[in-house]
């Protein structure tokens, strides 16, 4: 495997917080190649006390299977991908909307 194919985990972030009467978890993982381009990512919002399936993942975006996907409450749909920052912005916006629904 040449250095151009070697991936480096650039971001590995996880935080827990109180949400909707239980502990929620936000997870962000990003892998980059030798040119610092994002080649793999996983964004997940977990509320296991509200949604027990899919390891508690209420919302997520990833490209784990070579396809860009959005996961929501067990449903999976393919999504258009332009660049990682746009996908991350969309994810965090949706997390905010979901949190507001449960906190109102």
Regions found by a protein language model. Name each.
Residues 1-69:
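The feature represents the first ordered module of a protein
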Residues 74-104:
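Short, compact, well-ordered microdomains
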């Amino acid at each position: 495997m040449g250095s151009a194919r070697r991936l480096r985990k650039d971001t590995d972030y996880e935080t827990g917080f109180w949400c909707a009467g239980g502990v929620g978890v936000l997870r962000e993982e990003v892998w980059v190649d030798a040119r610092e381009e994002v080649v793999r990512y996983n964004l997940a919002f977990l509320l296991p006390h509200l949604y027990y399936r899919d390891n508690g993942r209420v919302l997520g975006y990833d490209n784990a299977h070579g396809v860009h996907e959005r996961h929501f409450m067990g449903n999976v749909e393919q999504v258009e991908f332009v660049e990682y920052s746009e996908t991350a912005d969309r994810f965090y916006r949706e997390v905010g909307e979901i949190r507001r629904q449960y906190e109102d």
